[in-house]
Structures are given as C-alpha cells and as structure tokens.
C-alpha cells in the first residue's frame, strides 16, 4: 500500500513509530497479558507511566518546578470553562485577545459564564494590504486590574500564528492546543497553558494543563469537581478515572519526541515543512494565502485556489494521490494543510509536488 499523508487539523495523525508500538503491545502491555486500556489507573504499572510522562513533558518544555502538570478531561472547550471558573471568582475581571475562531470561542464561553461586566476583549487582527496581520496591543498602557489575559497563539481555522511572546502585566493564559511542543517557548512567562491533545500530543479526550502554583490561590467559582485545578493537583490528575489510553499514547509521543532530539529539533523540521509549502503557494498565482508572512501559521497552512470551481477536483485528485483531509474549515472554505509534529517532510514534499502538477494541468 502506498503512503497516505493525513493533513487533518484534528484529530491529527500520530507518529508512525508510536502507532506501531501501540499496535504491537495492544493486547499485552508491559508483559501483563492485558491491554493498557484494561489495567487499573491506580495500579503501580500505570502510575509509573504517568510519572514518566510528566517527567518527559517537563524535560521537553523546560517546565519550572513551581508549575503543576495536569492530565485532564474535556478538550480545549472544557478548558474555556475551567479557566473562568477556576480564576475569576465573583468579582474578578479578565481580558481576551481575539485573533481568530478559537480565541473567539474562548471569549464567548467566558462571557456566557461570567458576563460582560467581568470580561473585556480586544480584536488584535487587522488588514494590511488585504492580508490578515496580528497587531499586539501595549498591555502595560491599559489601566485595568485583570486576573489574567487570555490568547491563542495559533488559530487553526484562520491559519494565523503569533510568534512574538506576549508582554503582559497580568498572568497570561494561553491556548496552545495546536502549537504545543511545535517550537520552544518560555513557560515561565505564563500563568497557565492548556492544550487539547489531539494535534501534537495524542488522541482526543485528553487535555494538558500547565499551571503556575500562585494561580491556584485566586478565588474560584467552579462547581465542577472534574474541572477543578486544585482538586486535580491534590489527586495527581486522578480525582476520577482519567482517559488512560490517551494518557498512554501521550507518554509514547513524548518519548518519541525526545528520541528525535526534543522540541528544538522538531521546531527546525516544522519550519522547513512550512517554508516548503508557503514557497509553493507564493511561487504560483494559482494559489493564494491571506495572511502576512510574519503571522503565517507553521502548523495550519490555509490557502485558496484562484478558481474556486476547481476545489472539488483538487480534493478528489489529492485523495487519490494519498493526500487526505485537505478541505478547509467550513467557516472559511478553501484548503488547509495541517503540519503538526507527526507530519514528515516527505508528506509535505508530496503535497507540493501534487500542487505544482495540479496547477500546471489547470492553468
């Protein structure tokens, strides 16, 4: 069977080596004669797995000791609610920076839970010569007392990424669902980081939360034990039964990434992949991208065909060539190629070759 390259935005492809290992030990994990899906989450074997997973993640991201690492339920949308309920209390205020669809969704959930009087927002995307560009605000000039400022450094739907570190007088809460471990960041700049697993970590159903110790002292509104960060810390992410198979696969992905040389090594590969695809788009008037170069996402490359009537043919022929899940999000249309850590350079090269051939045939 010829290679299939999956460009899905999420759930995304997992590293082939991780999938093969999971397949090999699916029915007999650690010599126990049963699957990892069948063992007790409180058994010594699984506890050892969780400890190693946290240690590997701390090493990969250089997480300081005054931060807790949590493995939680609920995905990114679950964290939209959890952040508000854990940090705002009855009187606290927060600022949301809006750069695309996912930061807008986080804002909407915050407004639903806390109301407009507690939630402020700023749109940070402007049009520069017809292209979307991020303009970060000078937060130090804002006269307000916020519990936190929330932003999403990578917008998967819009193909927008913010590479500059946010400078804020208030704790920063960041949705890193689509960019976690794709490039190095300084974790110590953040009050809390959360990420749904289904892009760069593992399968859906698991969320990673990295929270600074002092954030847990803020007044809480949460009435949901399952999304209470303090309870999660107290119970080592096992207040209730966790998504054990997703946790196992995340642990394997962390080990795989370490074997490649860590985040610094994969960041170079990710940069190569994105540059290769954007070069193809820029070199051919048959394709167009709507984001300024400085804010083009490395993880989610969005593009449109000059002739939209060819969209269906493009997708059909791409799939026949082993290039799947390239259809853009329903809100924006066009195409989207997601280049998460597990996507090999060969997959992007195959896509570029197909795009050049398709353009030549239809120009």
UniProtKB/Swiss-Prot annotation:
It is an enzyme of class 2 (transferase). It comes from the Bacteria. PROSITE patterns: AA_TRANSFER_CLASS_5. InterPro entries: Aminotrans_V_dom, Aminotrans_V_PyrdxlP_BS, Pser_aminoTfrase, PyrdxlP-dep_Trfase, PyrdxlP-dep_Trfase_major, PyrdxlP-dep_Trfase_small. It catalyses: O-phospho-L-serine + 2-oxoglutarate = 3-phosphooxypyruvate + L-glutamate; 4-(phosphooxy)-L-threonine + 2-oxoglutarate = (R)-3-hydroxy-2-oxo-4-phosphooxybutanoate + L-glutamate. L-glutamate binds at residue 42. The modification N6-(pyridoxal phosphate)lysine is found at residue 199. Pyridoxal 5'-phosphate binds at residues 76-77, 102, 156, 175, 198, 240-241. Pfam families: Aminotran_5. The gene is serC. Homodimer. Keywords: Amino-acid biosynthesis, Aminotransferase, Cytoplasm, Pyridoxal phosphate, Pyridoxine biosynthesis, Serine biosynthesis, Transferase. One of its GO terms (molecular function) is O-phospho-L-serine:2-oxoglutarate aminotransferase activity. GO terms for biological process: L-serine biosynthetic process; pyridoxine biosynthetic process. It is found in: Cytoplasm. This is Phosphoserine aminotransferase. The keyword Amino-acid biosynthesis applies. Its EC number is 2.6.1.52.
């Amino acid at each position: 069977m010829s290679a299939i390259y999956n460009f899905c935005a999420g759930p995304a492809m997992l590293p082939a080596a991780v999938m093969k290992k999971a397949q090999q030990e699916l029915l007999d994990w650690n010599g126990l004669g049963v699957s990892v899906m069948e063992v007790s989450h409180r058994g010594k074997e699984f506890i050892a797995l969780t400890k190693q997973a946290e240690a590997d993640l701390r090493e990969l991201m250089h997480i300081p000791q005054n931060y807790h690492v949590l493995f939680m339920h609920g995905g990114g949308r679950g964290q939209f609610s959890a952040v508000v309920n854990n940090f705002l209390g009855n009187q606290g205020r927060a600022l949301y920076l809006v750069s695309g669809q996912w930061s807008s969704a986080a804002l909407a959930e915050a407004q639903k839970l806390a109301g407009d009087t507690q939630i402020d927002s700023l749109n940070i995307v402007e049009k520069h010569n017809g292209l979307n560009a991020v303009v970060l605000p000078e937060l130090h000039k804002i006269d307000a007392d916020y519990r936190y400022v929330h932003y999403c450094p990578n917008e998967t739907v819009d193909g927008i990424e913010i590479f500059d570190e946010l400078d804020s007088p208030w704790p920063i809460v960041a949705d890193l669902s689509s960019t976690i471990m794709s490039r190095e960041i300084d974790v110590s700049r953040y009050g809390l980081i959360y990420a749904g697993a289904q892009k760069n970590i593992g399968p859906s159903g698991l969320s990673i939360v990295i929270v600074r110790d002092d954030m847990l002292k803020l007044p809480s509104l949460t009435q949901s034990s399952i999304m209470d960060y303090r309870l999660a810390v107290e119970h080592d992410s096992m207040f209730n039964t966790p998504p054990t198979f997703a946790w196992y696969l995340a642990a394997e992905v962390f080990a795989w990434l370490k074997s490649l040389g860590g985040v610094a090594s994969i960041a170079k590969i990710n940069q190569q992949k994105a540059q290769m695809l954007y070069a193809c788009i820029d070199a051919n008037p048959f394709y167009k991208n709507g984001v300024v170069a400085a804010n083009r996402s490395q993880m989610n490359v969005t593009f449109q065909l000059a002739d939209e009537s060819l969209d269906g043919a493009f997708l059909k022929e791409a799939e026949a060539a082993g290039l799947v899940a390239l259809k853009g999000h329903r809100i924006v249309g066009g195409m989207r190629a997601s280049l998460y850590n597990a996507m090999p350079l060969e997959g992007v090269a195959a896509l570029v070759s197909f795009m050049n051939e398709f353009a030549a045939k239809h120009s």
